[in-house]
Amino acid sequence: MKKVMIAIDYNPCAQKVAETGYAYAKALNAEVSIVQALSDISYYSIEYLPVMGFKGFSLDGPYSDIDEQRKEAYNFLSCVVRHLGDKKIRTKVLNGRMADSILEYADEWQADLIVIGTQSHRNYEELYSHDATSTILRQSNIAVLVVPADKKQLKLSKEKEYAFLQF
């Protein structure tokens, strides 16, 4: 295995996914690409607990604008790279339905392993694209490592009151 692609979102469980995927990649001496798929930004909370140095969305930008969404996503991925301490990590912001864009980029980049988490914005995501993790597992021709959600982090996330952006 020469290329490991780690797919994360803004969920606090993303830290465990990124760290686990990175540990596998380093053990395999593989290249790493960390990706985030942009779907409708209105499904993401503006009050997430800090994730790997990313403290949340700037409220300055019009998040109906894809360029602002991409900029914020790259800021998030930069925080992840700093957290992991490896400037050689590639980052990529993908557009479209989460599972589809992750699978397309994995093929394009010729990834040998896709690392994803079990926790997503399921209640909202299911309305539009079904569960991304199960879709990736069913449709991938590439090996997939699924990292279980950190129960402690999930508990903290559920206790926090979320405010969702409204457009």
Residues covered by each model-derived region:
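Short helix-capping segments at alpha-helix termini
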Residues: 27, 82-87
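A short acidic, glycine-rich active-site loop
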Residues: 55-72
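Active-site phosphate/pyrophosphate- and oxyanion-stabilizing loops and adjacent acidic/basic residues
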Residues: 19-22, 78, 134
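Small/aliphatic-rich secondary-structure junction motif
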Residues: 2-59, 163-167
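Charged docking surfaces used in two-component/phosphorelay signaling
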Residues: 93-101
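Rossmann-fold cofactor-recognition segment
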Residues: 89-91
